[in-house]
A protein has these predicted regions:
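Short acidic-capped amphipathic helix/loop micro-motif used as an active-site/signal-coupling element
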Residues: 41-46, 70-74, 155, 228
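Active-site core of bacterial EAL-family cyclic-dinucleotide phosphodiesterase domains
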Residues: 1-55, 232-235
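Flexible, glycine/charge-rich interdomain/linker segments that couple
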Residues: 1, 86-93, 235-238
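Helix C-cap/helix->beta junction micro-motif
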Residues: 83, 114, 147, 199-200
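EAL-family c-di-GMP phosphodiesterase catalytic domain
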Residues: 25, 39, 95-97, 122-132, ...
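Catalytic core of bacterial c-di-GMP phosphodiesterases, primarily the EAL and HD-GYP domains
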Residues: 61-136, 208
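Alpha-helical scaffolding segments of alpha/beta enzyme cores, especially the outer helices
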Residues: 75, 105-109, 136-146, 188-196, ...
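Catalytic-site/binding-pocket detector for metal-dependent nucleotidyl cyclases
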Residues: 14, 60-61
C-alpha cells in the first residue's frame, strides 16, 4: 500500500508540501518555516516521511520526491518574495539525494540559474552524512555555499559538535531535539554548547517543543529559537502559481 501510494503520488505530481513555523523566543515571532513532505493515501490520510522514507530509499524514489518538494518550495519562495515577506525556509536534503550524482548536478545547476533563492532557502543535512566526512559530500556542500546558500544540521544524534569545522563548511544553524537537550545535562553544559556554537556564528534551534512546561525549562537555558507543536503543527502550504 505504501509503495503504491508513493508511486501514485509521483505519477500524479501529488507530493504535498507542509510547513511548520520556527519562532524566536520569548517573542514567538515566526521567522522561518520547516518544509515537510506528505504523500496522500487514497482514503484522504497522509503518509509522513517516517512511514515511507526507508521504502522510498530502497526503491530509489527519494530523489524524485525531493525534486517535487523543491519545485513546490520554489513556487512558495517566489510568492513570498513577490509579497516582500522576510522569511526563510528550511529544506531537507536526504542522504540518498546527496548520493545521487545526476540529480545533485541538475539541482546545483538549477540553483545557480536562480540566484534570488539564496536569500530564502536554507538547506538541511543530517548529522550522519556530515559526520561521515565524505569528500564528495564536502564538495557538494561547498558548491551550495559558493552559490550563497545557508546550511543547517538536522537529525542530530549527539552533541559533540566541532563548531569550527561546521562553520568552515558554512553551517549557520543546528537543530536539536528538546528531549535530547534535557538529557544533555545542566544549565552550564547547555550554556557551553551555545557558547561554542555562537562563537562560530551558528544558531541553535530547539525542535519538538510540545508544552509550556517544556518551554519554561528551555527558556531557563537561554534558548532563543524554537520549533514544535506548541508554536504550530505542520500545515499544508497554500501556493500561488507564478504570475
Amino acid at each position: 500500500e505504501v509503495l503504491e501510494a508513493i508511486e501514485g503520488a509521483l505519477r500524479a505530481d501529488k507530493v504535498e508540501l507542509f510547513l511548520q513555523p520556527v519562532v524566536t523566543l520569548p517573542q514567538r515571532k515566526h521567522v522561518f518555516y520547516e518544509c515537510l513532505s506528505r504523500i496522500p493515501l487514497g482514503d484522504g490520510a497522509l503518509l509522513v516521511p517516517q512511514r515511507y522514507l526507508q521504502l522510498a530509499t530502497e526503491r530509489g524514489l527519494v530523489s524524485a520526491i525531493d525534486n517535487l518538494l523543491l519545485f513546490r518550495l520554489v513556487q512558495l519562495v517566489r510568492a513570498a518574495q513577490r509579497d516582500h515577506l522576510d522569511i526563510g525556509f528550511f529544506c531537507n536534503i536526504s542522504d540518498a539525494t546527496m548520493r545521487d550524482v545526476a540529480f545533485f548536478q541538475d539541482f546545483v545547476g538549477f540553483l545557480a540559474a536562480n540566484p534570488s533563492l539564496k536569500n530564502s532557502l536554507i538547506f538541511e543535512f543530517s548529522q550522519a552524512v556530515i559526520d561521515s566526512d565524505d569528500l564528495e559530500t564536502r564538495i557538494n556542500l561547498q558548491r551550495l555555499t559558493q552559490l550563497g546558500f545557508r546550511l543547517s544540521l538536522d537529525r542530530v544524534s549527539h552533541l559533540d559538535f566541532d563548531g569550527a569545522d561546521l562553520a568552515a563548511q558554512r553551517f549557520g544553524f543546528i537543530k536539536v531535539n528538546a528531549h535530547m537537550l534535557h538529557e544533555y545535562a545542566d544549565h552550564n553544559s547547555v550554556a557551553n554548547l551555545r557558547g561554542n556554537l555562537s562563537r562560530h556564528g551558528i544558531d541553535l534551534i530547539v525542535e519538538k517543543i510540545e508544552s509550556e512546561d517544556m518551554l519554561a525549562d528551555l527558556r531557563q537555558l537561554g534558548i532563543t529559537y524554537g520549533q514544535g507543536f506548541l508554536f504550530g503543527e505542520p500545515r499544508a502550504a497554500r501556493i500561488q502559481n507564478d504570475r
